[in-house]
From Swiss-Prot:
Residues 1-29 are annotated as: Disordered. This is D-ribitol-5-phosphate cytidylyltransferase. Homodimer. It comes from Homo sapiens. CDD domains: CDP-ME_synthetase. Keywords: Congenital muscular dystrophy, Cytoplasm, Disease variant, Dystroglycanopathy, Limb-girdle muscular dystrophy, Lissencephaly, Nucleotidyltransferase, Transferase. The keyword Transferase applies. Its EC number is 2.7.7.40. The record marks R59, K66 as: Transition state stabilizer. It catalyses: D-ribitol 5-phosphate + CTP + H(+) = CDP-L-ribitol + diphosphate; D-ribose 5-phosphate + CTP + H(+) = CDP-D-ribose + diphosphate; D-ribulose 5-phosphate + CTP + H(+) = CDP-D-ribulose + diphosphate. GO terms for biological process: axon guidance; isoprenoid biosynthetic process; protein O-linked mannosylation. Ubiquitously expressed, with high expression in brain.
Length: 451
């Protein structure tokens, strides 16, 4: 067993398939205290998780194993690890990965600063990988460096959207019943074909459920089940709950899961996952300007238009003054979208200050941060061509900060003297800003758009 995070700063490329938001929420943690037998005010120390991550992803139709496929330039498995490690009462996370991808996994752990992760080598099947992960937590293994948990969660590396509430439910049920698993209603009717390819029978959809992840077990129950497991079940079995029933006579409690427990299986699922992630990190926009007192400042006008046009998004504003203390707090609170208003048309001073603050923070490690550098110009008084040369500095700025996962765009908004025309320019600018934030298109960084 190997523990992270060794390896290089940049993840290596995953090998081809070989044949053969924030911390845990107080309510959930408090509820688990009685489950794990901890004293009030202390985090439970009896829950671990095992993630089998040795699959080839043949149904994905790409050479890279799906757990390493990038979403917003970050491997899928990193999102799943993040979902688990932000739950403070999961003390150890064991990932089973193939030998040829061990270095890849180490570098992912290092680059994205994952914690509490230990690595073991995967087996040739899913069940053998899970068994190897359980062995890393068992007391009877000579080289085991981890303490045995009371409850172990088994989850898929390619289900990145698991929430703490679902984890809490299955752990609580496993504590009481010995085993528990998340289920969802069947989407399609299940049929059984006969040998000649005709319908034999169909299942009544209302009476059956789809087994999902996560699942949780008393560690002694599932470890004993795997120790007794036949070679046939280790090779061809797919359901961990069935092993607990078959070998330990433990009937699992079935827990209704949330709709976002789905598994990334096909290539189209990667696009769906990316869309969900983009939506989640686009729910807040901070308008940054050089003043906080003048309500008629054009930055405040833009803020009000953004609020009007994007009524489903939280829009706030902060000044760069006071050493940026309030702005630093917004960064700590994980806002991933900034609109920086520059007072002088050709001056990037405010944008440069903001970029420096972002680069000094750890905000950009997990998700790309969008910065829209906004400049205003009365096109009737000053033709855009006269200022364009200075504004094109944004190209070089964008190249530099892209290396630190910051997506920098430029926006030039017409600033006419007529109030009605100004409102229309601001509205067009808000539409462009919303699109840049929603799409997060790295191909457009350094471009100067005009509203």
């Amino acid at each position: 067993m190997e523990a992270g995070p060794p390896g290089s700063a940049r993840p290596a490329e995953p090998g081809p398939c070989l044949s053969g938001q924030r911390g845990a929420d107080h309510t959930a943690s408090a509820s688990l205290q009685s489950v794990a037998g901890t004293e009030p005010g202390r985090h439970p120390q009896a829950v671990a998780a095992v993630l089998p991550a040795g699959g080839c992803g043949e149904r994905m139709g790409v050479p890279t194993p799906k757990q390493f496929c990038p979403i917003l330039e970050r491997p899928l498995i990193s999102y799943t690890l993040q979902a688990l490690e932000r739950v403070c009462w999961i003390k150890d996370i064991v990932v089973a990965v193939t030998g040829e991808n061990m270095e890849v996994m180490k570098s992912i752990i290092q680059k994205y600063q994952h914690k509490r992760i230990s690595l073991v080598e995967a087996g040739v099947t899913r069940h053998r990988s899970i068994f190897n992960g359980l062995k890393a937590l068992a007391e009877d293994q000579i080289n085991s460096k981890l303490s045995k948990p009371e409850v172990v969660i088994i989850h898929d590396a390619v289900r990145p959207f698991v929430e703490e509430g679902v984890l809490l439910k299955v752990v609580t049920a496993a504590k009481e019943h010995g085993a528990a698993g998340a289920i969802r209603p069947l989407v399609s009717t299940v049929v059984s074909p006969s040998a000649d390819g005709c319908l034999d029978y169909s299942l009544e959809r209302a009476r059956h459920r789809a087994s999902e992840m996560p699942q949780a077990f008393l560690f002694d129950v599932i470890y004993e089940a795997y120790q007794q497991c036949s070679d046939y079940d280790l090779e061809f079995g797919t359901e961990c709950l069935q092993l607990a029933l078959k070998y330990c006579c433990t009937k699992a409690k079935l827990v209704e899961g949330s709709p976002d427990l789905w598994k990334v299986t096909y290539k189209r699922d990667l696009y769906a996952a990316e869309s969900i992630i983009k939506e989640r990190i686009s729910q807040e926009i901070c308008v940054v300007m050089d003043t906080e007192e003048d309500n008629k400042h054009v930055g405040h006008l833009l803020e009000e238009v953004l609020k009007s046009e994007l009524n489903h998004v939280k829009v706030t504003s902060e000044a760069l003054g006071h050493a940026g203390r309030h702005l630093q707090q917004i960064i700590l609170d994980q806002c991933y979208n900034f609109v920086c208003v520059n007072v002088t048309t050709s001056d990037f001073q405010e944008t440069q200050k903001l970029l420096s603050m972002l680069e000094e923070s750890s905000l950009c490690i997990l998700y790309p941060v969008v910065v829209v550098s906004v400049h205003f110009l009365d096109f009737k008084l000053v033709p855009p061509s006269q200022k364009m040369e200075n504004l094109m500095q944004i190209r070089e700025f964008a190249k530099e900060v892209k290396e630190r996962n910051i997506l920098l765009y430029g926006l030039l908004i017409s600033y006419p003297q007529d109030d009605q025309k100004l409102q229309e320019s601001l509205r067009q600018g808000a539409i462009i800003i919303a699109s840049l934030i929603k799409e997060r298109n790295s191909g457009l960084i350094g471009q100067l758009l005009i509203a």
